[in-house]
Amino acid sequence: MENRWQVMIVWQVDRMRINTWKSLVKYHMNVSKKARQWLYRHHYDSRHPKISSEVHIPLGEARLVVTTYWGLQTGERDWHLGQGVSIEWRRKRYRTQVDPGLADQLIHMHYFDCFSDSAIRKAILGQIVSPRCDYQAGHNKVGSLQYLALTALIKPKRRKPPLPSVQKLVEDRWNKPQKTRDHRESHTMNGH
C-alpha cells in the first residue's frame, strides 16, 4: 500500500505569541467568562505528538478549531523555531481550513453584536447610543453603512486584556516591508 499524504496550511508563529494567545483564551474562558463556551484541550489530551494545544470555538452547528503545534521543521528565518498554528472550520463530517481574517469574522459574527437595530433609531432621535463592540479584530474590512455611522458616534472602549484574535496570532511582524522616507524626511539624502 502506498503512502497517503495530507497537506495542511500551518502558519509559522513564534513561541511567545502562542503563549500570549493561550493565556488570553484561558483568561476569557475562566475569568471574564466571555468565552466560557470555548473548549481548551491540552497537549496531553491529544494523541498527536506535535499538537501543543487545541481551542474549540462553537459557532452554532459548526465549530472553529485553532490547533497550535510544536516540534515542526524549522523555517528559513531565525525565529521560525518549529511552532505553528492551523485554523479549521468543522461541521459534522465536513472540514475546511480558513485564514485568520475569516476566522476572526466568524467569531465576531457569532459572539459579538456591535449595534442593535434600535441603536440606529436612538441615534437619529439624538439619544445616547451605548452598545460597543468588544471584538475589534473581527472588523478587518470596511463595515456596513450602519456600522460606519455608529462608530463615528461612539469610539470603542479598549478592553484589557484584549479578546484573543486569530489574525493577531499568525500576523507576520518580521517580514513587513520597510517604510522608506521621502526626500524631505531623509537626513542622508539632503546632507544634514
From Swiss-Prot:
The keyword Phosphoprotein applies. A motif (BC-box-like motif) lies at residues 144-153. Residues 169-192 have a biased composition (Basic and acidic residues). It is a peripheral membrane protein. Pfam families: Vif (PF00559). Residues 151-164 are annotated as: Multimerization. GO terms for biological process: viral life cycle. The keyword RNA-binding applies. Residues 75-114 are annotated as: RNA-binding. The modification Phosphothreonine is found at T96, T188. Residues 14-17, 74-79 are annotated as: Interaction with host APOBEC3F. InterPro entries: Vif. Residues 54-72 are annotated as: Interaction with host APOBEC3F and APOBEC3G. Residues 159-192 are annotated as: Disordered. GO terms for cellular component: host cell cytoplasm; host cell plasma membrane; membrane; virion component. Keywords: AIDS, Host cell membrane, Host cytoplasm, Host membrane, Host-virus interaction, Membrane, Metal-binding, Phosphoprotein, RNA-binding, Ubl conjugation, Ubl conjugation pathway, Virion, Zinc. Homomultimer; in vitro and presumably in vivo. Interacts with viral RNA and Pr55Gag precursor; these interactions mediate Vif incorporation into the virion. Interacts with the viral reverse transcriptase. Forms cullin-5-RING E3 ubiquitin-protein ligase complex (ECS complex) by interacting with host CUL5, RBX2, elongin BC complex (ELOB and ELOC) and CBFB/CBF-beta. Within the ECS complex, Vif interacts directly with host CUL5, ELOC and APOBEC (APOBEC3F and APOBEC3G) substrates. Counteracts the innate antiviral activity of host APOBEC3F and APOBEC3G by promoting their ubiquitination and degradation. Acts as a substrate recognition component of an E3 ubiquitin-protein ligase complex: mechanistically, Vif hijacks a host cullin-5-RING E3 ubiquitin-protein ligase complex (ECS complex) and the transcription coactivator CBFB/CBF-beta to form an active E3 ubiquitin-protein ligase complex that targets APOBEC3G and APOBEC3F for polyubiquitination, leading to their degradation by the proteasome. Vif-defective viruses show catastrophic failure in reverse transcription due to APOBEC-induced mutations that initiate a DNA base repair pathway and compromise the structural integrity of the ssDNA. In the absence of Vif, the virion is morphologically abnormal. This is Virion infectivity factor. It comes from Human immunodeficiency virus type 1 group M subtype J (isolate SE9173).
